[in-house]
Structures are given as C-alpha cells and as structure tokens.
Amino acid sequence: MTIEKRRQGTVAASLFGQFEGAHNVAEEYKGPKYVVVTGGVISGVGKGLTTASIGKILQQYGYSTTAVKIDPYINYDAGTMRPTEHGEVWVTDDGGEIDQDLGNYERFLGLDLPRSNNLTTGQIYHTVIERERRGEYLGETVQPIPHITDEITRRLQEAGAGYDIVLVEIGGIVGDYENEPFLFAVKTLERDLGEEHFAHLLITYLPIPPHVGEMKTKPTQQAIRMLSEHGIFPDFIVCRAETATDEVRKKKIQIGANVPYDHIISAPDSETIYN
C-alpha cells in the first residue's frame, strides 16, 4: 500500500531538492512548504498511507513535518458516523473524533496531532455562518468564494505554523463536486505564497480488467486532465495497482502529465503497509 522502498528515496529526494531550491526565491515568505495530495480514479486507493510515508521520509531529511486531512463531507466530524460508513474513528489527545487517516499520520510521524488538523466542509461552513451571525462580515454578502475558501486557507496556514513542511491530503477523488472549494482554496494559497512553495502529488489507480489482462492508463489520464482544470498540475504521480507499473505505462502517463519520468512512482499492492 505504501511507495516501495527503492522509490521512496526518489520522491523524497525530489521534494527535498525542489524545496531547497525555493529557499531564496521568496525571502519575504518564512512559512512552511506545502505538499498537496489528491486522488484519482477511485477512493480508498491509499492516499493516507502514502501521505504518511512521504512525511516520514521528509522527517528523515531533517524537515519538521505535519499533516492535515481534508474531508469534504457535511458532517462536523467523524464522531457520529457509522464505522461501516467511514471506517474506525480516531480520537486525538485533545478529544477530537477524527478520520482514521489522522491515526496513520500520528503513528508514522510520531506526532500528537490536534483535532484542528482535520478539516471538514461542515466545520468550515459552521465557522463562517457563526461569524456572519455575529456581524463580523459587516453586512457583506457571504459566499463560497471568497469567504468559505478564505476560511480553508486560514485553517491550513494555522495548522502549518511552526513546521517546515505541511502535507495536505484532500479526501475523495479529483472530480468530486464537494472538493471544488478545497481545490480552489489550495490554488489561491499557492498563488498568494508562490508556486515554489508547493508540490502537488496525485495518487491514482491503474485498473487491470480481467477480460483484457493488462493495465489501463486512460482513467489516470482523465484524472490528470480534471486536476488541470483547476489550474493544478501534478509534480509527482503515484501509480497504485495490483502489480508494478511497467515502463510502457509510465511513459504514457509521462506524456499526458508532462512530468519527469522519475516523478512517476509505482506503488503495487503489498502484504503489509510497512514495506
């Protein structure tokens, strides 16, 4: 489920070099760098474990790293959701009832993350509506853009304060309507802080239809296209599949994504998540 060991060094070293080169580009910005993780084709593809794995590798390079999980559902948190609906609930030290991906982050990174590192659509709207009721918007027409997206960017920056790198995992997949405000907010933050402070990683799934017996890249190409419609172009693509992604498929993805060949990472199924 995680990036195979021999490839982990590749993606981490590339991220390391990308951020090292950005240190002197915008000296006025002293905040963290952001690694934004999105998913393509299907959910449950392993975004949380991959995010946690990359975070651990970046820690080994000496970066202080934290992680944020975005869940686009209207529920305020995962506390009242059935386990069969959304998996087990992870309880943080400060009492937050959170998506189970926070548990993976804590175990892999060795951190006690606060409940505020889990953003949901319900939380964002709740905060904005409460502010509107208190008159904090001074009579403005409160809208998804900019008020909702501004609250998202505020939460992301708050979560990253004091760290070198913030991993931001956006739940679901590219193309989900409920993810639109979060993708817009991420792009807005990238524009405001500078693209040199951002790296985008797409985790996609390459199916192998039984009647064909070969890996198909077309769904991944469509995911890349849908992500580009938001002005976001992946710097790295992690290819989840039953088996390793071969050279032919990697080259097809490379052409469609316009990324270096070694930024396309094969992540086949594994017997244990710690391999």
Roles of regions detected by a PLM:
Residues T2-G9, L15-N275:
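Flexible phosphate-sensing "switch/lid" loops adjacent to ATP/NTP-binding sites
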